[in-house]
């Protein structure tokens, strides 16, 4: 069988300053056969995206130093002239990037952008033929009313439709290789499932090779033949996807697999108290003519975790902000048996919620200073205690947010929420931006803190597997309303509402056979999005 991709002893170095460099990829070798599918899996900083970019020569002009050898469809990428690389890119090999908004020109219609790519590689094609090809591929990737939507601009598409449009652009010239770099990371679970199903179907129809770059092992389970696990720029393990996911040989691969949240996870037994800490009755929140939350009622008991799940636009984040008083409801009643400062929040993005010009110690101290109950010496001591409580070195008090990793910054956010000794913390997507092992660590930390301090948690997320790990009861939201609620085991094991069933059917699983079966089962449940 002919190798479509051959990478031999690849090294990639980036200059960090005038005298030093960072090695992003170190001695990597692999092949991808024509028509095959390989998953390149690793956490942030593993070198997987740098490798994918190098396959198309996208390192040129970045200051990166490349060593080794890369051949893609017979082209020596490292020695090829620019003209030869242009013929390769988009023609015989194409790439789908993580963020479609940054890849699509906001000024031009989506169909015109696809037609332009087609004409670059087919200069004799007429404008009309190129536009017809754009409509054809948009229709193929599942864009409804493709001829009309080809005239739409990117902002008029949903996130899932923009990703479909990028895939259509990549398919315009019938490439032999498609490189997909984290193509579903920013998408809701049902849209993610649709995109992965689309890639699977396109492979089957066209025979193209697929290199799928991702940090999510669940994503590769039903999408590729082989998996290459990367860590620190090196290949840790490679093998058939079923073998690597079921019986990983290397400790790092095993740690990745064990950290993946599962729908069948056994939750630690908890015995929440009967007294109600917070009660919401018929909460409604409108923004102009848009209703974000529409008549939601709930209770949170002392010591329990209430999971709130839903996709983008479901109203779950707005609900969470109302519960802690950051947003006032338009109507409805919100009652709590503790003072307002006992209701705290951990935000999704710690980068935007921490002041980059202030040390993390000072940020954690803010709610303590606002209370005016402790002197400066006591405040510093309390902050150091909190840093230690969340697993950070107390001596890091004077460090700034940019000096920490994403998981460490989220620990800082948790420490700040703990500062006023809260009774309830609303966690808004606290692990959605984290690698799977860091995600598991943060979830474990929250559970440990809850057990030790007797806290109540409202855990807001779109990841149903994570929510099951932590929740006693679950609310499922769609379009601002609660469509299903109940004990977590009942909602997950016997969902009643079609939307809940569709969400659960779309959750990635680690078993390739089960993944294939779920793909078949969900086709009748999931609309195009």
Question: What role is predicted for each listed range?
Answer:
Residues 56, 60, 324:
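Helix-to-loop junction immediately C-terminal to a conserved catalytic motif
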Residues 64-76, 331-341:
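Conserved ABC transporter NBD signature motif
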Residues 76, 129-148, 377-395:
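Conserved ABC ATPase "signature" region
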Residues 152-157, 161, 400-404, 408:
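Conserved ABC ATPase signature
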Residues 172-176, 419-423:
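A short, proline-enriched helix->beta-strand linker immediately N-terminal to the Walker B motif
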């Amino acid at each position: 069988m002919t190798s479509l991709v051959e990478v031999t002893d690849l090294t990639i170095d980036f200059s960090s300053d005038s005298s030093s460099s960072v090695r992003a990829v170190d001695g990597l070798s692999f092949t991808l056969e024509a028509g095959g599918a390989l998953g390149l899996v690793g956490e942030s900083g593993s070198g997987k995206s740098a490798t994918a970019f190098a396959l198309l020569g996208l390192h040129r002009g970045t200051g990166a130093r490349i060593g080794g050898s890369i051949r893609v469809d017979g082209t020596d990428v490292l020695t090829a002239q620019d003209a030869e690389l242009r013929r390769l890119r988009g023609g015989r090999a194409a790439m789908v990037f993580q963020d479609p908004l940054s890849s699509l020109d906001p000024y031009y219609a989506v169909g015109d952008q696809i037609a332009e790519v087609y004409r670059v590689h087919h200069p004799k094609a007429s404008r009309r033929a190129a536009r017809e090809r754009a409509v054809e591929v948009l229709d193929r990737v599942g864009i409804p009313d493709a001829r009309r939507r080809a005239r739409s601009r990117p902002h008029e598409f949903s996130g899932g439709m923009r990703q479909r449009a990028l895939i259509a652009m990549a398919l315009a010239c019938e490439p032999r290789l498609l490189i997909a770099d984290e193509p579903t990371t920013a998408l809701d679970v049902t849209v993610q499932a649709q995109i992965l199903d689309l890639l699977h179907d396109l492979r089957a129809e066209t025979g193209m090779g697929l290199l799928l770059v991702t940090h999510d092992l669940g994503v590769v389970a039903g999408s590729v033949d082989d998996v290459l696990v990367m860590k620190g720029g090196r290949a840790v393990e490679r093998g058939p996807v079923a073998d690597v996911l079921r019986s990983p040989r290397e400790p790092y691969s095993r740690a990745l697999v064990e950290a993946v949240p599962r729908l069948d996870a056994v939750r630690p037994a908890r015995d929440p108290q009967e007294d109600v800490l917070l009660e919401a009755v018929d909460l409604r929140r409108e923004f102009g003519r848009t209703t974000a939350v529409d008549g939601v009622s709930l209770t949170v008991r002392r010591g329990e975790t209430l999971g709130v799940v839903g996709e983008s636009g479901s109203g779950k984040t707005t609900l969470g902000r109302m519960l802690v008083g950051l947003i006032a409801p338009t109507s409805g009643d919100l009652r709590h048996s503790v003072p307002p400062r006992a209701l705290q929040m951990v935000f999704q993005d710690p980068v935007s919620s921490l002041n980059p010009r202030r040390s993390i110690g000072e940020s954690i101290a803010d709610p303590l200073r606002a209370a005016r109950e402790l002197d400066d010496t006591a405040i510093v001591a309390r902050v150091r205690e909190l840093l230690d409580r969340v697993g950070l070195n107390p001596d890091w008090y004077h460090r700034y947010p940019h000096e920490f990793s994403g998981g460490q910054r989220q620990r800082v956010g948790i420490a700040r929420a703990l500062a006023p000794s809260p009774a309830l913390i609303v966690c808004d997507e606290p692990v959605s931006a984290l690698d799977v092992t860091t995600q598991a660590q943060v979830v474990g930390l929250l559970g440990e803190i809850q057990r030790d301090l007797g806290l109540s948690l409202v855990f807001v997320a779109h990841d149903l597997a994570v929510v099951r790990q932590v929740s006693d009861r679950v609310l499922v939201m769609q379009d601002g309303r609660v469509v299903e609620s109940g004990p977590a085991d009942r909602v997950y094991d016997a969902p009643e509402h079609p939307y809940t069933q569709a969400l659960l059917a779309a959750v990635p699983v680690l078993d390739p056979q089960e993944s294939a079966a779920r793909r078949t089962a969900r086709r009748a449940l999931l609309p195009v999005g």
